Structure formats: structure tokens, C-alpha cells
Regions:
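N-terminal "arm"/small-domain region of PLP-dependent enzymes with the aminotransferase-like
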Residues: 1-28, 339-340
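Phosphate-binding glycine-rich loop
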Residues: 29-76, 90-101, 166
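PLP-dependent aminotransferase class I/II
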Residues: 37-41, 50-52, 124-128, 138-139, ...
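Structural detector of well-ordered beta-strand residues that form the stable sheet scaffold
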Residues: 53, 78-79, 99, 151-152, ...
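PLP-dependent aminotransferase-like
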Residues: 67-155, 162
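Hydrophobic/aromatic ligand-binding patch that stacks against planar heteroaromatic rings
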Residues: 89-91, 143, 167, 184, ...
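Conserved active-site segment immediately N-terminal to the catalytic lysine
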Residues: 153-188, 217-223
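Active-site PLP attachment segment
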Residues: 170-209, 213, 233
Length: 366
């Protein structure tokens, strides 16, 4: 018998009422109302920087961040082959060339793999904090400093993750966030944010997202080719509502569910690698990934995951194709099962997923 899982996202009545108020006001464009600026200020304060710029989606955040850093034609950027494609195609969008490095068993780039991919044309590295895990940023930042590289943090799946007590997105030169439908929070289906300690970077993003506007000019003047990548007032008011309840409801539930999964399955004989969650690298768990030991199964990992899914539980097979052939990444992407930990779930939903995993493992392990 399959279960009916709670949907995600779900918006509370307070946020829905605020959306209605914005609609009634008729001030729905970023430049006609106050909510866009309010959302940016609230997010900047929450993440721990002074500068934040909202954009239309996470892909735009990455693209505009690279252009704001001066990355362009003739440059190379080190990327992971193991992420949603926007984590690398943003480099092409900026006119530069992505160069792929392999990942570690934690699913993410590390300093050693990045070092092997650096050439005389390398100008930056994009570090993806995958699945809500936090990359080992200390050695990466040290390498970048030695080699004169910019560090872009792709935090699309890691809102609220921390490295040595600092939120992801504030460690490198620029941090990029996504508020797409399935993410930790959404601004009504799409949305993104760019943050930086460097006001010049965020001013450049602010200009690029608005057709090349010279920030602060009135009447508007333009000095570069830009784009239309602004959030609407409706999206911003949704973002404010989701941010307000993130630390009190959303993130604690994700972490509690993840801790239960780690206790229950971290030592299971079928699990080869469990997710990284330490005091130094504090995960925020978009999902909880376990890498399975395929040699211990009588079937493929894909077939195993399909069997677990038949119990109606929230597990996920990684669907992204690799963007380059790298051995560690290839071994991970086909053998990883992800457990959703949406805050709308109940403890019983997570317990049912554990039960289904164990049942199928008992039947399908050699």
C-alpha cells in the first residue's frame, strides 16, 4: 500500500494574504513597490553580509555573478561535472570555458581536484554545495588565494549550510542562491539571490539584471549591455514569508529528519558513503544522499531505488547526466539514493522511508 506524502512547497495563510495585498495594490514590478528591496535587505542580514541582489532564478544568479567578476571570453572556470547543468553552463553564458574537475566521495569539488584542473587561463572556480552538504572550503579558499582565483559558491541546494559557523555564500567572492520550486524555500516557483561582501560586485549584478543600468542614476542611464532578470513584488513577498519561518520551522525539521536517517541507515551494510555533516561542515539537507555499494546488490541501484519508491516514500534517483566523464563522479551519480526531508513531512514519513529501504535491502542484497 502506497503512502500519500505531503506536498512541497506549501505556503502559510499569512504569506498568501500578503500576496493578495500586493496584487490589490497594483504595485507588482520591482520598481513600483517596496517588497523587492525589503527582501534583499532581510536576506543580506540573515546570511551575514551587507549586499544582496535578487534575480529571476538561480541560473541567472550564477551567470550574472560571473560577469560581475569580469569573467568572459578567453577565461576558464573550474566546475564540477556532477550537478544540475546550470552550475557549468553559466560559464558558457558568460563567454568563458568550463573546465571540469572530479569530485570527492562527498559529491563535491575539493582543493586537490581543483588544482589539477588549473591552467594559465583559469580565473575562477565554482564550488557547488551539493544536496545541502557543505564543501571543504578552507583548503579551496587557500588554493584560490595562492593562485589568484575568484571563488563562486553555488548554494542553490544549501540554504542555511555553514562552514566553521559562517553561512555558505559568504565564504568566497560571491554566493548564488536558487529559490526554485523544489528548493529549501521558493519565491513562487522561480527566483534567486546574489550576495557578496564586495559592494562593487553586487552593484555590477544590480546593473546587469536591469539592462545595464548605472546604479543610482536618475533618470536612468546605462553603460553596459544587461538583461532583464529582476524578481517581481509578488515573488519577493513570498520570499520574505519563507525566510521568516526558515530558522524556526523549515531548517530544524530538515536537520531532525536527516539526523534520524543518519542514525538509522548510516551504518547499514549497503551504504558505502553517508552524507557529511560535522561541526565544521554543517549541512542544511536539501535531501539526504547515501551512496550504495552496488556490488552487494543482486540488481542495479536504479532497480533498487524503484523498488523502494513503490512503497510511496520520498526517495529520489539522481537524474542529472554527468557533464564530463570523471571516474569518482561517475561512480557516485549512478549509485546514490536521495531521501527527501521536506519540512512538511512528518516523522512517520521518514520512518516509512527507512523501513522501505531496509525491506528492499533484505530482499535484494546478495
Amino acid at each position: 500500500m502506497t503512502r500519500a506524502l505531503p506536498s512541497w512547497p506549501q505556503f502559510n495563510p499569512k504569506t498568501i494574504g500578503r500576496v493578495a495585498a500586493v496584487l490589490k495594490s497594483g504595485k507588482v514590478n520591482y520598481w513600483t513597490g517596496p517588497e523587492g528591496a525589503r527582501f534583499e535587505a532581510a536576506f543580506a542580514k540573515w546570511v551575514g553580509v551587507k549586499n544582496a541582489v535578487s534575480v529571476s532564478n538561480g541560473s541567472a544568479a550564477l551567470h550574472l555573478a560571473l560577469e560581475a567578476l569580469g569573467i568572459g571570453r578567453g577565461d576558464e572556470v573550474v566546475c564540477t561535472p556532477y550537478s544540475f547543468r546550470a552550475s557549468a553552463t553559466c560559464v558558457n553564458n558568460a563567454g568563458a570555458k568550463p573546465v571540469f574537475a572530479d569530485v570527492g566521495t562527498d559529491h563535491m569539488l575539493n582543493a586537490a581536484s581543483i588544482a589539477k584542473a588549473i591552467t594559465k587561463r583559469t580565473k575562477a572556480v565554482i564550488v557547488v554545495h551539493l544536496y545541502g552538504q557543505v564543501a571543504d572550503m578552507g583548503p579551496i579558499l587557500a588554493l584560490a588565494k595562492r593562485r589568484g582565483l575568484k571563488v563562486v559558491e553555488d548554494c542553490a541546494q544549501c540554504l542555511g549550510g555553514e562552514y566553521r559557523g559562517r553561512k555558505v555564500g559568504t565564504l568566497g567572492d560571491v554566493g548564488c542562491f536558487s529559490f526554485c520550486q523544489s528548493k529549501h524555500i521558493t519565491t513562487g516557483g522561480e527566483g534567486g539571490m546574489v550576495v557578496s561582501r564586495d559592494r562593487k560586485v553586487t552593484d555590477a549584478v544590480r546593473s546587469l539584471r536591469d539592462h545595464g543600468w548605472i546604479v543610482g542614476s536618475s533618470p536612468k542611464a546605462f553603460d553596459r549591455i544587461g538583461y532583464n532578470s529582476r524578481l517581481t513584488e509578488i515573488q519577493s513577498i513570498i520570499g520574505l514569508g519563507e525566510l521568516e519561518r526558515f530558522d524556526s520551522w523549515n531548517l530544524p525539521r530538515r536537520r531532525n529528519f536527516a539526523e534520524y536517517l543518519l542514525r538509522s541507515l548510516g551504518g547499514h551494510p549497503l551504504v558505502k558513503y553517508a552524507p557529511v555533516d560535522t561541526k565544521v561542515r554543517k549541512a542544511s539537507f536539501w535531501l539526504v544522499p547515501f551512496v550504495l555499494d552496488a556490488k552487494k546488490l543482486k540488481c542495479s541501484v536504479a532497480r533498487f531505488i524503484e523498488a523502494v519508491q513503490k512503497d510511496g516514500v520520498g526517495v529520489y534517483k539522481i537524474m542529472w547526466p554527468l557533464m564530463a566523464k570523471k571516474p569518482v563522479a561517475a561512480g557516485l551519480i549512478g549509485n546514490t539514493i536521495g531521501f527527501w526531508v521536506h519540512p512538511t513531512y512528518a516523522k512517520d514519513d521518514i520512518a516509512a522511508a527507512v523501513k522501505a529501504f531496509r525491506k528492499v535491502a533484505d530482499a535484494m542484497m546478495k
